[in-house]
Amino acid sequence: MADKADKMKARLPRGFVDRVPDDLRAAEKMMATIREVYDLYGFEPVETPLVEYTDALGKFLPDQDRPNEGVFSFQDDDEQWLSLRYDLTAPLARYVAENFETLPKPYRSYRNGWVFRNEKPGPGRFRQFMQFDADTVGAPNVSADAEMCMMMADTLERLGIQRGDYAIRVNNRKVLDGVLDAIGLEGEGNAAKRLNVLRAIDKLDKFGPEGVRLLLGKGRLDESGDFTKGAQLPEAAIEKVLAFTAAGGADGAQTIANLQAVVAGNAKGEEGVQELADMQALFFAGGYEGRVKIDPSVVRGLEYYTGPVFEAELLFDVTNEDGQKVVFGSVGGGGRYDGLVSRFRGEPVPATGFSIGVSRLMTALKNLGKLDVSDTVGPVVVLVMDKDTQNLGRYQKMVSDLRKAGIRAEMYVGGSGMKAQMKYADRRAAPCVVIQGSQEREAGEVQIKDLVEGKRLSAEIEDNVTWRESRPAQITVREDGLVDAVREILDAQARDRAEQSK
């Protein structure tokens, strides 16, 4: 036996989680539904590696001179830096650029997979999480952006989220850029200040207009005493930005009219408003006008969005960690990123896409009761009598017969006795167990114990003697009738579950 001091401590790295069977099944069930919708829209699957050359991630890294800042990086044997992918979009850009001549344009693809962030973990903030993306590369007009929004709406409804419980919110970075240009923040020299303005607007849902006003100005002091320095805009500029965020009207047409008034005279802003008007017409033509909303407060934080931006928001209330009722909020978003593939090509390559946060959407569906995997049935367990090694072949045949009939089954392969085997079957959520002792074998029979029915009856029989004598939920059948008998038990349990779920 190893010395106690030499024992390695089993510990999960911070910011990572283990996933148990129910979580895995729920995720696969959800992603299978998403794939069905994306396939219906004519998108094709593609998969890129978890690792990319660090320079392929480019400006999406917080600091290119410190490759481990923000991403997990290591050096190859040729001293080139490699990184675990930060998102699914930058790898797609590399893939498209590398295969540009052979791919159909527009290139419509979807992919899901793990992404990694080398950031400080916290509640609900992980270093590894799954995304599900769809992108169209090579389509310059806003019909591709509108399609992304419509596809997201269809996806949420296919997953069981009702109309009225979600909204796809749409804005256009060109409109905001027009506003920023109008207040004197044009050009690369004002990039940092523009980013501060974007971050302030992004806090609109959290802090409200007055909180954003403070963040656009000198700064905001929160309840804990922490001070966040503001963008230092003059009052007139603050009013202009707030007028932009408050331009939402009773419907899309009114919102667009309000935005036209805000950006009047600015060519870039007017171009953005026209793109929103074109998208609104497509939403109306497709019957999505009540599901997709033009909303000037949407500001995606990533710098590479160049035109329309969109966000999928769930509108129902949930209880947060402090016991407060809050709106669930965003489960995904995206937009147009015309500059991303162009980095590799040296020519304009328009692109647009949408990314779903898989874990967050799973949480939402569980809250709504739309992702129940409790109907997953454990395996039928064929028990092995103590030290009965010479009849293992017979037990194995029972398992094989059940599997051939499409029934999940396993033979107990541990070294414990019957009591421990029954406990094992219970932990495996087995619907029933199969038992064959020497007497049953001589008679060509097996015993089948319905564990679900047994649990129910055990609550009704309080007398141990009666329990032992009655052997509730246990039947004896001919060995060649095993499959049919097990199927009857499984069918009865399925009917009971269906009845209970009504």
UniProtKB/Swiss-Prot annotation:
Record field: catalytic activity: tRNA(His) + L-histidine + ATP = L-histidyl-tRNA(His) + AMP + diphosphate + H(+)
GO BP of this protein: histidyl-tRNA aminoacylation
Key words of the record: Aminoacyl-tRNA synthetase, ATP-binding, Cytoplasm, Ligase, Nucleotide-binding, Protein biosynthesis
Top-tier EC class: ligase
MF annotations from Gene Ontology: ATP binding; histidine-tRNA ligase activity
Record GO cellular component, one term: cytoplasm
Subcellular location: Cytoplasm
Lineage: superkingdom: Bacteria
Main localization category: cytoplasm
Enzyme Commission number, as recorded: 6.1.1.21
Gene3D superfamilies: Anticodon-binding domain, Bira Bifunctional Protein, Domain 2
PROSITE patterns: AA_TRNA_LIGASE_II (PS50862)
Matching InterPro entries: aa-tRNA-synth_II (IPR006195), aa-tRNA-synth_II/BPL/LPL (IPR045864), Anticodon-bd (IPR004154), Anticodon-bd_dom_sf (IPR036621), His-tRNA-ligase (IPR015807), HisRS-like_core (IPR041715), HisRS/HisZ (IPR004516), HisRS_anticodon (IPR033656)
UniProt family annotation: Belongs to the class-II aminoacyl-tRNA synthetase family.
Assembly information from the UniProt record: Homodimer.
Protein name in UniProt: Histidine--tRNA ligase
Provenance organism: Brucella suis (strain ATCC 23445 / NCTC 10510)
